[in-house]
């Protein structure tokens, strides 16, 4: 079993977004953009996967999103 901490931590990432659901949505959509050819906004040495890059971008404050106030009608 690996004995290391995930960096950045979930606690740190949750300070950048409203809640866990927003974190999942923002990082997954950004990872999809990277897969589709968008340039990475941060340089992460060991980021082999688009999701890892997206997580580091959220942590660096490079990714923004807009919460919709309206609910389902």
Curated annotation (Swiss-Prot):
EC number(s) on file: 2.7.7.6
- What UniProt keywords apply to this chain's record, in alphabetical order? DNA-directed RNA polymerase, Nucleotidyltransferase, Transcription, Transferase
One Pfam family, short name please?
RNA_pol_Rpb6
Gene Ontology molecular function, alphabetical = DNA binding; DNA-directed RNA polymerase activity
What would be one Gene Ontology cellular-component term for the protein? DNA-directed RNA polymerase complex
Q: Give the catalysed reaction(s), semicolon-separated.
A: RNA(n) + a ribonucleoside 5'-triphosphate = RNA(n+1) + diphosphate
| Superkingdom assignment | Bacteria
One biological process GO term for this chain?
DNA-templated transcription
- List the InterPro entries: DNA-dir_RNA_pol_omega, Pol_omega/Rpo6/RPB6, RPB6/omega-like_sf
Which NCBIfam families does the protein's record reference? rpoZ (TIGR00690)
* Function, in words: Promotes RNA polymerase assembly. Latches the N- and C-terminal regions of the beta' subunit thereby facilitating its interaction with the beta and alpha subunits.
Q: Which family does it belong to?
A: Belongs to the RNA polymerase subunit omega family.
Summary of subunit composition and partner proteins: The RNAP catalytic core consists of 2 alpha, 1 beta, 1 beta' and 1 omega subunit. When a sigma factor is associated with the core the holoenzyme is formed, which can initiate transcription.
Q: What is the name attached to this protein's record?
A: DNA-directed RNA polymerase subunit omega
Q: What is the lineage of its organism?
A: Bacteria, Bacillati, Bacillota, Clostridia, Eubacteriales
């Amino acid at each position: 079993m690996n004995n290391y901490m995930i960096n950045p931590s979930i606690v740190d990432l949750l300070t950048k977004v409203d809640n866990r659901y927003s974190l999942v949505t923002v990082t997954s959509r950004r990872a999809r953009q990277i897969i589709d050819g968008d340039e990475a906004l941060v340089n992460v040495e060991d980021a082999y996967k688009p999701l890892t890059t997206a997580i580091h971008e959220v942590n660096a404050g490079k990714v923004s999103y807009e919460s919709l106030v309206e609910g389902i009608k």
